[in-house]
Amino acid sequence: FSAAEKLHDDGYKFVLDLVGFFEDEYKERVELLESKGVVKFHGFQEEPRPYYATADCVVMPSYHEGMSNVNLEASATGRPVITTDIPGCRESVENEYTGWLCEPKSVNSLYEKMKAFLETDISKREVMGKYARQKMVDEFDKKIVVNDTVKALKL
């Protein structure tokens, strides 16, 4: 949350919609950021598609994610993604092409990537979203993944 708070303090106008769970240790911080207009907490949602549909970008930093469904879903809906340069996340995002990769555990790196997004013009954001969608079709379609898995396992 520190990167978002710093951007807000630096005068950038945005609201992060928080969808899903977070640890209890963040409760007070989220409530404070919500009162400042930095975030809006929605909790767990059975149907996340409406949130992707209204998002300009999806921010999903992680220390240990594996293959992130959030990144895949966001990209499939044509949204640029800001995520961490770790195994699993880096496979779904091409840095500065379909989104941005930040350094793990680096508030400054996440800040810089979020700032880069906010300073990117809308037409370029839309192009990045289209590239993200196409990457999902070309590399992560279920038939492709199953065929690649069968080949890898030599079944």
State where each predicted segment sits.
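Short, structured helix-loop element that forms part of the nucleotide-activated donor/catalytic region
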Residues: K6, D10-V38, H42
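Aromatic "clamp/platform" in nucleotide-sugar-dependent glycosyltransferases that forms part
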Residues: F44, Y63
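Short acidic alpha-helix that forms the nucleotide-activated donor recognition element
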Residues: E46-A55, A76, R90, E94
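Short glycine/serine-rich donor-binding loops of glycosyltransferases
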Residues: S68-N71, C89
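Short hydrophobic beta-strand element within catalytic cores of glycosyltransferases
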Residues: P80-T83, V93
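Conserved acidic donor-binding segment of nucleotide-sugar-dependent glycosyltransferases
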Residues: N95-E96, W100-V107, A116-I122
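A short, well-ordered alpha-helix in the C-terminal region of glycosyltransferases
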Residues: A116, S123-E139, V145-K151
